[in-house]
């Protein structure tokens, strides 16, 4: 935003004619103000990233100048000629209105000239050394100022006690939790340009890669990656069905001239994809909240319907800085499982919050991930409902079989839409957290979006709403699993592998020669008929090469069939989960025993078909 200050003996203006971008209801069409500070303002395109912070930062600048000049009358005058890269009209009006409101709250007499009108004005500058000044407010500086306003306190909850983090010997904490604490305190170790392990793995395993012809942070998924994503998506949707959640689909783009949409976007405070369509400022959603809340506002609800859950697998977008985009950890386009729960009151919300936090822990175990946890809350909520933290810690101990510390961030007052939230993070191979699931108690959106329910007396009330992603984005899930398997290999010497139910290929049949190919095909067809993702290595390659290739692809079960196996009617199966680099775990079993084992490891999980040729002689390699 560009600001031009004129300390004036007199300022008068008259709005004479509308332009096509004029605000519909101008605050005032003409005015004459004496002894005032005139603020000519141009809201710029970059300000659309965080209009709220820009408005607040601009008001700070105005207060600084007004204080020095001892001016208590302010004229806010939209003046597009101060900049070339102007914000959309909707955002500009939003910022100017917010500035007007903030100045009035701080005791100033404010006159705001209408936006988008041709106006005549007369100005008499006082002419002293400070009577003409200018300022530039940038989004970066505005966001930094916003963050500095409310300082949070960090504590560690362990052994039933809350201990200020500065009183804790970090060297005695578990390594992954220590990395989490240092990250939250801004003290994480330097990793330079070192690439996370999963970036190489996602390419090697033909899962996905960045698409060079697209915007940064947008990826293309290869057939194996598509299978993994579908398994994860169906897994979460099945969980939601078990919870009784209604599945919905909503648009990806929203109009920022809608007050509720704009205000909720401001609360997010991070970078957003914004698009202009004529004079309209539109935003690509960064989560499913916008569509979910608009849908709920049009839903007739009573107390007996609550708690009500609605779920969407949302394609979402965040305009991350290009230098911050890393592998699958931070993207500009991602797929987020989003659950929203409408609750009658805070008691019901807390009950649901704990149940959903437990669900996140259970999901992590299904994915082979153990999380470190940050509980974020206001002082008031922690004081009144400390049992929420205690029950969360108990749930972690039950899930992991041992007590784990919890990092607690306490805000002196609420600055977001949530009263409390819990974030679950997996620590990657470089010691950095990958934030995955989250549960939040939202105390603002019910009122903001006009969502109501009829209580037992028939009175309309605004609900408390929970936000929950039981996995985090599908991309980050895959990122965490790959990082976890790399750590498993580096720290324990165990071979990396995906859970069997997620593996693109669950079993591979390898005939040792042409003589046994027919028998190998029978085993292959039987496993395929049972619904498993199985392929047949029918290439004209040495057996050793075939086995090595299966290992490089992390195939959980490799079945080698030779003449001896055909004679005995058994299978020689290499079990990757139980193997190390030094020693392969091979077991002789019947086909029925292998089927039983695969059934156990995939029970209750999605059965997604293989979408590439199931004979390796016909399969291309995807990726660069």
From Swiss-Prot:
One of its GO terms (molecular function) is tRNA binding. Binds 1 zinc ion per subunit. Its cofactor is Zn(2+). Its EC number is 6.1.1.3. InterPro entries: aa-tRNA-synt_IIb, aa-tRNA-synth_II, aa-tRNA-synth_II/BPL/LPL, Anticodon-bd, Anticodon-bd_dom_sf, DTD-like_sf, Thr-tRNA-ligase_IIa, Threonyl-tRNA_syn_edit_dom_arc. GO terms for biological process: threonyl-tRNA aminoacylation. Residues 1-143 are annotated as: Editing domain. Residues 598-624 are annotated as: Disordered. Gene3D superfamilies: Anticodon-binding domain, Bira Bifunctional Protein, Domain 2, D-tyrosyl-tRNA(Tyr) deacylase. Residues 197-499 are annotated as: Catalytic. Keywords: Aminoacyl-tRNA synthetase, ATP-binding, Cytoplasm, Ligase, Metal-binding, Nucleotide-binding, Protein biosynthesis, RNA-binding, tRNA-binding, Zinc. One of its GO terms (cellular component) is cytoplasm. Coiled coil: none annotated. It is found in: Cytoplasm. It holds the Pfam family HGTP_anticodon. Zn(2+) binds at residues 289, 340, 467. It catalyses: tRNA(Thr) + L-threonine + ATP = L-threonyl-tRNA(Thr) + AMP + diphosphate + H(+). Belongs to the class-II aminoacyl-tRNA synthetase family. Homodimer. Catalyzes the attachment of threonine to tRNA(Thr) in a two-step reaction: L-threonine is first activated by ATP to form Thr-AMP and then transferred to the acceptor end of tRNA(Thr). Also edits incorrectly charged L-seryl-tRNA(Thr). The N-terminal domain is an archaea-specific tRNA-editing domain that hydrolyzes incorrectly charged L-seryl-tRNA(Thr). Catalysis of tRNA editing is performed by the charged tRNA itself. This is Threonine--tRNA ligase. It comes from Methanopyrus kandleri (strain AV19 / DSM 6324 / JCM 9639 / NBRC 100938).
């Amino acid at each position: 935003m560009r600001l031009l200050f004129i300390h004036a003996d007199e300022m008068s203006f008259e709005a004479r004619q509308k332009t096509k971008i004029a605000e519909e209801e101008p605050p005032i069409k003409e005015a004459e103000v004496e002894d005032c500070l005139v603020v000519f303002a141009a809201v710029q395109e970059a300000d659309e990233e965080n209009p709220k912070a820009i408005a607040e930062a601009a008001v700070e600048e105005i207060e600084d100048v007004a204080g020095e000049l001892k001016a208590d009358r302010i004229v806010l005058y939209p003046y597009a000629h101060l900049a070339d890269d102007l914000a959309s009209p909707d955002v500009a009006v939003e910022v100017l209105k917010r500035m007007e409101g903030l100045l009035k709250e701080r005791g100033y007499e404010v006159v705001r000239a209408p936006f988008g009108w041709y106006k005549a004005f007369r100005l008499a500058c006082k002419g002293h050394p400070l009577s003409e000044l200018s300022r530039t407010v940038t989004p970066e500086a505005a966001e930094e100022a916003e963050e500095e306003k409310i300082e949070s306190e960090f504590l560690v909850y362990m052994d039933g006690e809350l201990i200020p983090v500065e009183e804790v010997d970090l060297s005695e904490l578990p390594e992954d939790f220590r990395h989490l604490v240092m990250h939250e305190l801004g003290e994480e170790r330097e990793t330079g340009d070192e690439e996370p392990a999963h970036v190489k793995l996602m390419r090697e395993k033909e899962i996905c890669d960045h698409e060079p012809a697209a915007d940064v942070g947008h990826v293309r998924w290869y057939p194996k990656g598509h299978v993994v994503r579908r398994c994860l998506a169906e897994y979460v949707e099945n969980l939601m069905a078990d919870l009784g959640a209604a599945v919905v689909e909503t648009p990806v783009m929203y109009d920022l001239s809608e007050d509720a949409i704009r205000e909720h976007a401001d609360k997010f405070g991070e970078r957003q994809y914004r698009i202009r369509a004529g004079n309209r400022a539109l935003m690509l959603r960064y989560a499913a909240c916008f569509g979910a809340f608009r849908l709920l506002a049009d839903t007739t609800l009573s107390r007996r319907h609550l708690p009500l859950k609605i779920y969407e697998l949302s394609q979402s977008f965040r305009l991350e800085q290009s230098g911050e985009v890393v592998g699958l950890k931070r993207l500009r386009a991602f797929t987020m499982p989003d659950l929203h729960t409408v609750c009658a009151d805070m008691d019901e919300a807390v009950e649901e919050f704990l149940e959903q936090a437990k669900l996140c822990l259970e999901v992590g175990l299904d994915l082979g991930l153990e999380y470190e946890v940050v509980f974020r809350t206001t002082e008031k909520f922690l004081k009144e409902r400390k049992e929420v933290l205690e029950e969360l810690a108990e749930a972690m101990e039950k899930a992991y079989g041992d007590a784990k510390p919890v990092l607690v961030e306490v805000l002196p007052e609420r600055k977001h839409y949530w009263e409390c939230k819990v974030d679950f993070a997996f620590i990657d191979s470089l010691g950095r957290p990958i934030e995955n699931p989250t549960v939040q108690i939202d105390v603002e959106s019910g009122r903001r979006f006009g969502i109501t329910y009829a209580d037992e007396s028939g009175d309309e009330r605004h609900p408390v709403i929970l936000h929950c992603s039981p996995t985090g984005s599908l991309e980050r899930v895959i990122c965490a699993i790959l990082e976890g398997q790399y750590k498993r290999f580096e720290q324990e010497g165990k071979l990396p592998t995906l859970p069997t139910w997620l593996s693109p290929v669950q079993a591979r049949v390898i005939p040792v020669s042409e003589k046994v190919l027919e028998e190998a095909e029978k085993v292959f067809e039987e496993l395929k008929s049972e619904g498993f993702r199985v392929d047949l290595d029918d290439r004209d390659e040495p057996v050793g090469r075939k086995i090595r290739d299966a290992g490089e692809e992390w195939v959980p079960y490799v079945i080698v069939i030779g003449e001896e196996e055909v004679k005995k009617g058994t299978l020689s199966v290499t079990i990757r989960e139980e193997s190390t680099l030094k020693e392969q775990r091979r077991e002789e079993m019947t086909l029925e025993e292998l089927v039983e084992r695969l059934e156990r490891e995939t029970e209750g999980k999605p059965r997604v078909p293989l979408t590439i040729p199931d004979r390796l002689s016909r399969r291309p390699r995807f990726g660069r």
